């Protein structure tokens, strides 16, 4: 039935059977589309599917009087594969909404397709701020984070904590350049100073020459504007060089899942920005324990996986409000009209451009002697209100925003 792409499991929300070949509209059908076998699989993957399942179960398994069902697939980080899956889901399998979607190119294509077919796209793993900017649609909600918040918001937050002088270690390709640009603008806007930057090729194995330039810069903060294995390798080598004895590392895209690979000895003192951490309060801790019980590796949830849970909950509330899932534009309008409230992100709102607003946290990696368990990795340094973390609605050039 699905020869042209790799598919994960098809899940009936509360343990029911496989959906019939007719794919009838006797149920609400949710698709979780993400990387389940590649570089982002640890960060979303099966964890996002688990989060969606938990949300459906916690909501009661039905919306607008119909059972809610989840289907999932691996887009393999290939645009043609991801777009092909989304089109098949919409055209032949009556999927009402697609969630998660790390990989900005696929996310932008699916957002456009969702508008054309009057479906719903809710991005948690997607990063590009274009989803609520020039490429916004009335059928899209961008839930968890974006490049503006991670770059510019983090720069401002660290300067406010006293990190005034910056030097950037940046991956030499479009993503790294954009991340560096956003962070630089945040630093300067907050009154900080950028002393310089050095660019490294994707997949660099030896960072010695780049780290020597960072050490010699005299900066208080070294902003690490790369991702994945590059982040792990560069931060490990920075610790080995002794750079962290006099300078603080700020990982612009270092998430919780990357820290165990680094080890607390190498990562200690590094700062990151995130809208969710499992140890924030009783609600986040309870969710994390339930999540870990289901996860094959017993991992705790990260922000993007938490975002899938929260966004599925709010989507189901909107489906109930509208009385069905068939009219995607009406469902998204209802999502925007209702305040958001869930145990992971608390109370929030969705703006007219589709941007979900919630606080971010400036977090610092704990020292080894401060950690009491495998996932006890971070401590909160500061809280950044959502209206300060995300791009102002007036600056995004979203055509849905009234001038």
Specify the residue positions occupied by each region the protein language model found.
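Bacterial N-terminal signal peptides
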Residues: 8-18
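Extracytosolic ligand-binding ectodomains
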Residues: 3, 8, 23-403
